[in-house]
Amino acid sequence: MNYRMLGKTGLHVSEIGLGAEWLERHNYEECKAIIDECYASGINILDCWMSEPNVRTNIGKAIAEHRSEWYIQGHIGSTWDGGQYVRTRDMAKVKPAFEDLLERLGTDYIDLGMIHFVDSEKDYEEIVNGPFIE
């Protein structure tokens, strides 16, 4: 596996990462097998979008043994509400969703944070100049 410095972060990440959203279609055993194969192949970065809660639990259990060797990219700005993905900038919803991500992943940190679904310059301005960044 080849690795590159990720911008100015100091993180050396694999050129290939695991986009975990599609793991929603798989049970724990399949998630574990996929994540183990990625780990064995040298993949060390996992993008965990705020998707269906159970898949985040499965991912957390699957990476637990090697958590410190994975770079987790988590997303904020979306939540899971009533079985449906919901885009939101409401911190009263965003913060508990992020805390749930940490809990389900079995960790107290993520390595990289992404603001989910910034679709226009107006979205960007509202995020940068509003309470979302604070």
Give residue ranges: language-model regions.
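N-terminal binding-site loop/beta-alpha segment at the start of enzyme catalytic domains
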Residues: 1-74
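Generic anion/oxyanion-binding catalytic loop in active/binding sites
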Residues: 20, 48, 83, 99-102
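Short, surface-exposed alpha-helical recognition segments that flank or form part
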Residues: 26, 47-50, 85, 89, ...
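Glycine/Thr-rich phosphate-binding loops of Rossmann-like dinucleotide-binding domains
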Residues: 26, 56, 82, 120-123
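Glycine/proline-rich, positively charged
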Residues: 40, 86-134
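Structural motif corresponding to the early beta-alpha repeats
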Residues: 51, 65-92, 116-119
